[in-house]
Every structure is written in structure tokens, then in C-alpha cells.
């Protein structure tokens, strides 16, 4: 996604998707993880897939994006949880202490709209960007709970070790138990490999301020 491209807000313009052009960048800010927001996202995905004549991949791409959004929302909840408990997520001793209680208590807050509002008040966000260039749909998710280098290394290790494994093998033999088996990310990559001919169909990285997950769909 070109950083110099002007960004069109889908949130602010009801008719933003009526005439999608090559190279345009569209932004959708996920205000909350409500069913209404998810339904809006599905409609957005449908419009972009129509543009590249790949409507048949609608359900699978929605599944991938929902998993990525879920991961982003959970990351924001985790960060907000640590902040509200005066714990530094980057300090090993605080991280270990915080994760013990977070796994039991923190994720239950995902449906607590008061906590969701608190997350927004802290300035934490999930933003989605969509652009089509030369027939390739790029969907980029950004959230400002920055993934650590260690976590990125774990994700890439999981992806590497999952190559040439069947879905059954992946579920029967989890690769890394750190904060879950990471099967969601692995399945996203496998799904994208089936519906996209782009060699770099999935990537996750981090800047100093954001975690960036990119999906490329090329018929």
C-alpha cells in the first residue's frame, strides 16, 4: 500500500465503494467488535472481490479477515489490560505476571462494551485498508499494539514448520504452545495459498508504532 496515496474513509462516506478505481486506498476503522461492524466488513469485502471477479472466494477471505481482526482486538485488549493493571508488557517479570491473570480474566472483556470504550479512549485502534493494483487486492490490517520481534519470529517459525502439513496434522500437533497454538495464523496462510496466486499472499510485520498484517489476493 502506497503511503503517499490519498486515503478514502469508508466510515465517513456511505457511497465510497460505488466506483472503486485502481490505486485508490480505502480505510475502514473498526469502531467495535460488534456484529454490525462485522457485517459492514463483509459488505466491503464483497465489493472489492467483485472488482477483481473473485466473488467465489468471499467466504474464505471473510474468514481470514475475521481471524486477523480477532487477533488485533485481542492484542489491544491485552495492552489495555496491562496498562490498567500498571504492568509493563515489555518487562519479562510484568509480562509473566500479567499473562497469568489475563488468560483467565482479560479475554472475557472482549464482549464488555465498557472495556471496549476504554480501549478506544486509550487511543488503541484496528484499521483496515483495501486497495486494488493491477488486478491484485491488498488488504492490510493495522493496530497500534505493537507485536514484539520475538512474537514475529514465533509466527514465522510456525508458518515455516506448517508447510506441507495437512489441516489434520496441524490440529493434532500444535507447534508452539506460547499463548496458544497459533493455528489461526497458519490456517490463514493455507487458505490464502489456495485462493491467491500471489507468492507473498500473507505477511506480518511491525513498525515502531503498529503491527501490520497484509493479505494479497491475486486471481
Mark where each language-model region is.
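Bergerat-fold GHKL ATPase/HATPase_c domain
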Residues: 1-122, 153
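Conserved glycine-/histidine-rich ATP-lid loop and adjacent helix of the Bergerat-fold HATPase_c
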Residues: 185-201
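A short beta-strand-to-loop motif within the catalytic HATPase_c
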Residues: 79, 201-208
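Short beta-strand element(s) in the Bergerat
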Residues: 22-27, 126, 135-139, 211-213
